[in-house]
Amino acid sequence: MISIFVFERSVKFVDYKKMFDKQLIGLEIDGENEEQVFEQVAEHLKNLGFVNEGYLKGITSREKKFPTGLITQHLNIALPHSDPEYVEKPFVYIARLKNEVRVKQMGDSQLMKVKNLFFLGIKDPKEQVGLLQAFMELFMNEEFVRAFIQEEDKQKIHHLFTQNI
Protein backbone atom coordinates (compact mmCIF):
# COMPACT_ATOMS: atom_id res chain seq x y z
CA MET A 1 0.00 0.00 0.00
CA ILE A 2 1.36 3.42 -0.89
CA SER A 3 -0.08 6.24 1.16
CA ILE A 4 -0.31 9.82 0.00
CA PHE A 5 -0.08 12.73 2.40
CA VAL A 6 -0.72 16.35 1.43
CA PHE A 7 1.02 18.99 3.53
CA GLU A 8 1.29 22.63 2.53
CA ARG A 9 0.65 22.04 -1.18
CA SER A 10 3.19 19.27 -1.46
CA VAL A 11 2.40 15.64 -2.11
CA LYS A 12 4.45 13.01 -0.32
CA PHE A 13 4.39 9.35 -1.32
CA VAL A 14 5.27 6.94 1.47
CA ASP A 15 6.33 3.44 0.51
CA TYR A 16 6.16 1.46 3.74
CA LYS A 17 7.62 -1.65 2.07
CA LYS A 18 11.10 -0.14 2.47
CA MET A 19 10.71 -0.23 6.26
CA PHE A 20 10.68 -4.04 6.33
CA ASP A 21 13.94 -5.99 6.53
CA LYS A 22 14.44 -9.74 6.84
CA GLN A 23 16.91 -9.10 9.69
CA LEU A 24 14.10 -7.46 11.64
CA ILE A 25 11.90 -10.49 12.18
CA GLY A 26 12.07 -12.38 15.46
CA LEU A 27 9.83 -15.45 15.66
CA GLU A 28 10.80 -17.00 18.98
CA ILE A 29 11.32 -14.05 21.30
CA ASP A 30 11.29 -15.16 24.90
CA GLY A 31 10.26 -12.60 27.48
CA GLU A 32 8.21 -12.87 30.62
CA ASN A 33 6.92 -9.31 30.32
CA GLU A 34 6.78 -6.30 28.05
CA GLU A 35 10.00 -4.83 29.48
CA GLN A 36 12.04 -7.96 28.72
CA VAL A 37 10.71 -8.04 25.16
CA PHE A 38 11.51 -4.34 24.70
CA GLU A 39 15.06 -4.90 26.00
CA GLN A 40 15.74 -7.74 23.55
CA VAL A 41 14.33 -5.92 20.55
CA ALA A 42 16.05 -2.64 21.44
CA GLU A 43 19.42 -4.38 21.75
CA HIS A 44 19.00 -6.10 18.38
CA LEU A 45 17.94 -2.86 16.68
CA LYS A 46 20.84 -0.96 18.25
CA ASN A 47 23.36 -3.60 17.14
CA LEU A 48 22.09 -3.31 13.56
CA GLY A 49 22.23 0.51 13.61
CA PHE A 50 18.50 1.16 13.35
CA VAL A 51 18.24 2.96 16.71
CA ASN A 52 20.52 4.84 19.07
CA GLU A 53 21.39 4.38 22.73
CA GLY A 54 18.28 6.19 24.02
CA TYR A 55 15.78 3.99 22.16
CA LEU A 56 14.95 1.59 24.99
CA LYS A 57 14.23 4.41 27.42
CA GLY A 58 12.32 6.29 24.73
CA ILE A 59 10.09 3.39 23.76
CA THR A 60 9.41 2.41 27.38
CA SER A 61 8.53 5.97 28.33
CA ARG A 62 6.28 6.51 25.33
CA GLU A 63 4.49 3.21 25.85
CA LYS A 64 3.66 4.19 29.45
CA LYS A 65 2.12 7.49 28.29
CA PHE A 66 0.58 6.26 25.05
CA PRO A 67 -0.06 2.49 25.09
CA THR A 68 -0.24 0.76 21.71
CA GLY A 69 -2.05 -2.53 22.33
CA LEU A 70 -4.83 -3.16 19.81
CA ILE A 71 -7.60 -5.69 19.96
CA THR A 72 -8.48 -6.47 16.37
CA GLN A 73 -11.14 -8.85 15.14
CA HIS A 74 -8.65 -11.61 14.34
CA LEU A 75 -5.52 -11.03 16.45
CA ASN A 76 -4.38 -8.87 19.35
CA ILE A 77 -1.26 -6.87 18.49
CA ALA A 78 0.85 -4.03 19.86
CA LEU A 79 2.54 -1.32 17.80
CA PRO A 80 5.19 0.18 20.09
CA HIS A 81 7.14 3.14 18.77
CA SER A 82 9.39 5.84 20.16
CA ASP A 83 9.93 9.48 19.36
CA PRO A 84 11.90 10.03 16.12
CA GLU A 85 15.11 11.22 17.80
CA TYR A 86 15.85 7.62 18.85
CA VAL A 87 15.48 6.22 15.32
CA GLU A 88 18.50 6.20 12.98
CA LYS A 89 16.83 4.44 10.02
CA PRO A 90 13.09 3.81 9.46
CA PHE A 91 12.03 0.23 10.20
CA VAL A 92 9.34 -2.22 11.20
CA TYR A 93 10.51 -4.99 13.54
CA ILE A 94 8.18 -8.00 13.61
CA ALA A 95 8.29 -9.73 17.00
CA ARG A 96 6.45 -13.00 17.57
CA LEU A 97 6.77 -14.14 21.17
CA LYS A 98 7.00 -17.66 22.56
CA ASN A 99 4.43 -16.69 25.19
CA GLU A 100 1.92 -13.90 25.55
CA VAL A 101 2.80 -10.80 27.56
CA ARG A 102 0.52 -8.21 29.08
CA VAL A 103 0.44 -4.75 27.51
CA LYS A 104 -1.87 -1.79 27.87
CA GLN A 105 -4.53 -1.18 25.29
CA MET A 106 -4.48 1.95 23.15
CA GLY A 107 -7.05 4.46 24.30
CA ASP A 108 -8.19 3.15 27.67
CA SER A 109 -4.98 1.54 29.05
CA GLN A 110 -6.79 -1.67 29.99
CA LEU A 111 -4.48 -4.68 30.25
CA MET A 112 -4.56 -7.16 27.40
CA LYS A 113 -2.37 -10.04 26.21
CA VAL A 114 -0.39 -10.12 22.96
CA LYS A 115 1.98 -12.51 21.28
CA ASN A 116 2.73 -10.32 18.26
CA LEU A 117 4.34 -6.90 18.47
CA PHE A 118 5.34 -4.65 15.60
CA PHE A 119 7.97 -2.10 16.59
CA LEU A 120 7.69 0.95 14.35
CA GLY A 121 10.77 3.08 13.74
CA ILE A 122 9.43 6.31 12.34
CA LYS A 123 11.79 9.18 11.43
CA ASP A 124 9.12 11.55 10.08
CA PRO A 125 6.20 12.06 12.51
CA LYS A 126 3.92 12.85 9.54
CA GLU A 127 4.18 9.20 8.49
CA GLN A 128 3.04 7.78 11.84
CA VAL A 129 -0.73 7.97 11.36
CA GLY A 130 -0.60 6.44 7.88
CA LEU A 131 1.57 3.55 9.03
CA LEU A 132 -0.69 2.85 12.01
CA GLN A 133 -3.72 2.88 9.69
CA ALA A 134 -1.99 0.51 7.28
CA PHE A 135 -1.35 -1.96 10.10
CA MET A 136 -4.93 -1.72 11.33
CA GLU A 137 -6.19 -2.47 7.82
CA LEU A 138 -3.86 -5.47 7.49
CA PHE A 139 -5.00 -6.98 10.76
CA MET A 140 -8.66 -6.55 9.91
CA ASN A 141 -8.07 -8.84 6.91
CA GLU A 142 -8.78 -12.39 8.09
CA GLU A 143 -6.93 -14.02 5.19
CA PHE A 144 -3.79 -11.97 5.87
CA VAL A 145 -3.93 -12.70 9.61
CA ARG A 146 -4.38 -16.42 9.02
CA ALA A 147 -1.39 -16.48 6.66
CA PHE A 148 0.74 -14.50 9.12
CA ILE A 149 -0.12 -16.71 12.11
CA GLN A 150 0.57 -19.94 10.23
CA GLU A 151 3.83 -18.83 8.61
CA GLU A 152 7.09 -19.69 10.38
CA ASP A 153 9.59 -18.77 7.67
CA LYS A 154 11.09 -15.27 8.00
CA GLN A 155 11.53 -14.86 4.24
CA LYS A 156 7.86 -15.68 3.63
CA ILE A 157 6.71 -13.37 6.44
CA HIS A 158 8.79 -10.56 4.94
CA HIS A 159 7.19 -11.25 1.55
CA LEU A 160 3.69 -11.37 3.09
CA PHE A 161 4.08 -7.90 4.58
CA THR A 162 5.82 -6.26 1.64
CA GLN A 163 3.15 -7.57 -0.73
CA ASN A 164 0.23 -6.43 1.41
CA ILE A 165 1.16 -3.15 3.08
State where each predicted segment sits.
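Cytosolic covalent-transfer regions centered on His/Cys nucleophiles
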Residues: 2-165
